[in-house]
UniProtKB/Swiss-Prot annotation:
SMART domains: CBS (SM00116). Required for O-acetylhomoserine sulfhydrylase (OAHS)-independent homocysteine (Hcy) biosynthesis. Together with MJ0099, catalyzes the condensation of sulfide with aspartate semialdehyde to generate homocysteine. Likely functions through persulfide intermediate. It comes from the Archaea. Gene3D superfamilies: CBS-domain (3.10.580.10). The ligand-induced conformational reorganization of the protein could be an important regulatory mechanism. This is L-aspartate semialdehyde sulfurtransferase. Keywords: Amino-acid biosynthesis, CBS domain, Methionine biosynthesis, Repeat, Transferase. Homodimer. May form a complex with MJ0099.
Length: 509
């Protein structure tokens, strides 16, 4: 069996004799030559990814002013940085919004970071509390990346091994970290580099760990050299993540890009590339993983819960084709829909990361490192936060009516049951509209005769497993005082009103 060492591979790199290929190129080599010959021939496989990595940020040491200040509240271009460290140390997070509500997420922490990498001036404003050794109360200066002592990028969670795709079952579009999701499953968004993904290429499914990547692994980070410093937050193979660090002063704005997800927040697109030493045949075989080999779950992001419904399972080859067929339920009907797919990450840039890293190694500018420890194994635990669901406050049994009744008959139902909302259903109990006591009053004033003339047909609804908080937001957004609760087949199972929610929150107080 072929066995190499990183030391031997580094010697070949220094001599200009190493064979280095990208993960894309490795697929063809293994297909044509087999894993054994590929392991003998290839020394290093380069990988790459380029996507939105919200859990990113930079530690900055500004140097001491004269007289010195102990910074308490720190702002960079009006974006707050965390200052609970030493006197002039701070951490600026990529997802931090702007303090100006008119700017908000359009210019956040990610934009500050990109501006620094681009060499632009950034306004630093800091407030402090005075001490004998730090007498200054505030400072307001303009700085560039060259002016600060250190700017160390430390990203708690980057480089997802597997990223779920997203779709939306709701009747309105929603705004998420996966971009804008259209109503009624009308698009699917995905993220990730697939066959170029670093952790996919290094994963060992038998041990549920990684073959070569670990603490101390040298990497390509944002156009400079960085290191893996541990497993990332929420690391849980086969959903692995990495915590990485690198010198911001070495980085290239081509591979560090700020972005804003509409109505969600600012984020930082980061280019990460990791070299995988081909130490044996098994590693060579894994480095030939293809898009069609990587399973991607598609979840319904229209369901406002931590555990979202699984809609389908697919792979990156299908997702990259630009369309996908889903079997879904809409208004109680099982339908087959072919919809567009879209990526919120860049495969083109991921390829460029892998190609750039490959050239660095071929030029002898980048040597591999031995990991000093493997990545930890962790079990993700949910937050222990209480939640009240719609079914917990649901008014049952539902009082409903059919659309063929008169205005007077509807008014009698409202008075008899002391209610203000009356869902209108068809012969199968499926929701077709709703009327309120206000609708009745208007109908009488306008001499309307039938329910069909006055009912609202485009009805905002809720589900039993929906959080009450979310329903309250929905009612406020659409300026309504009640929502029918329906099942998966749009049959009415109850109703939630503003009075129900007021009683709930009043009881909490």
């Amino acid at each position: 069996m072929i066995m190499k060492t990183i030391k031997e591979i580094n010697e070949k790199i220094k001599k200009g004799e190493a064979v280095v290929v990208t993960a894309e190129e490795m697929i063809k080599i293994v297909e044509e030559e087999g894993a054994k010959r590929a392991a003998d021939y290839v020394d290093v496989v380069t990988t790459g990814t380029f996507g939105a990595m919200c859990s990113s940020g930079v530690f900055i040491n500004f140097g001491h002013s004269d007289p010195p200040i102990k910074m308490l509240r720190i702002y960079l271009n009006n974006v707050e940085a965390y200052g609970g460290l030493a006197a002039v140390d701070a951490y600026i997070g990529a997802a931090q919004p702007n303090e100006d509500p008119d700017v908000d997420i359009d210019y956040g922490g990610a934009h500050v970071i990109e501006d620094l990498v681009r060499g632009k001036e950034v306004e630093l404003y800091a407030e402090g509390y005075t001490t004998d050794c730090y007498p200054r109360k505030e400072v307001n200066v303009r700085i560039t990346l060259d002016d600060v002592n250190q700017a160390i990028m430390v990203n708690p969670r980057n480089c997802y091994q597997t990223y779920a795709a997203a779709t939306n079952s709701r009747e309105e579009k929603i705004y998420t970290y996966m971009g804008i999701l259209l109503p009624e499953y009308n698009n699917v968004h995905y993220s990730g580099a697939g066959q170029l993904n670093p952790l996919q290429n290094d994963y060992n499914p038998e041990t549920k760990s990684f073959n070569t990547i670990g603490i101390g692994t040298r990497i390509f980070l944002g156009g400079g050299i960085g290191y893996v410093i541990g497993e990332g937050t929420q690391h849980n193979p086969p959903f692995g993540t990495l915590m990485v660090k690198g010198d911001l002063k070495q980085m290239n704005p081509k591979f560090i890009r700020a972005a804003t997800m509409p109505r969600y927040g600012s984020t930082l697109y980061v280019g990460i590339g990791i070299p995988i030493p081909v130490l044996n045949e098994k590693i060579a075989e894994r480095c030939a993983i293809r898009d069609e080999d990587i399973e991607v779950p598609i979840y319904d992001y229209g369901f406002p819960r931590r555990d979202r419904p699984l809609i389908a399972k697919t792979n990156y080859k299908v997702l990259r084709s630009g369309k996908i067929t889903l079997n879904v339920n809409i208004d109680g009907k099982d339908v087959e829909k072919t919809v567009k797919t879209g990526s919120v990450s860049s495969y083109k840039m991921a390829r460029e990361v892998a190609e750039t890293l490959k050239q660095w190694i071929l030029d002898g500018k980048f040597l591999l490192t031995e990991r000093v420890d493997t990545l930890g194994r962790a079990e993700n635990k949910p937050m222990k936060s209480p939640i009240t669901l719609v079914k917990d406050i649901l008014s049952k049994p539902p009082i409903t009516a059919h659309s063929n009744i008169s205005i007077m008959e509807a008014a009698k139902i409202l008075i008899k049951h002391n209610i203000n909302h009356l869902p209108i259903v068809d012969e199968h109990g499926k929701l077709v509209g709703i009327i309120t006591s206000w609708d009745i009053a208007k109908a009488l004033a306008q001499n309307k005769k039938t329910i069909e003339e006055i009912m609202t047909r485009n009805v905002i609804t809720a589900h039993e497993d929906e959080p009450v908080d979310h329903v309250a937001i929905k009612m406020s957004k659409y300026n309504i005082s009640g929502v029918p609760v329906v099942d998966d087949y749009r049959r009415v199972v109850g109703i939630v009103t503003s009075e129900d929610i007021s009683r709930l929150f009043g009881g909490k107080k």
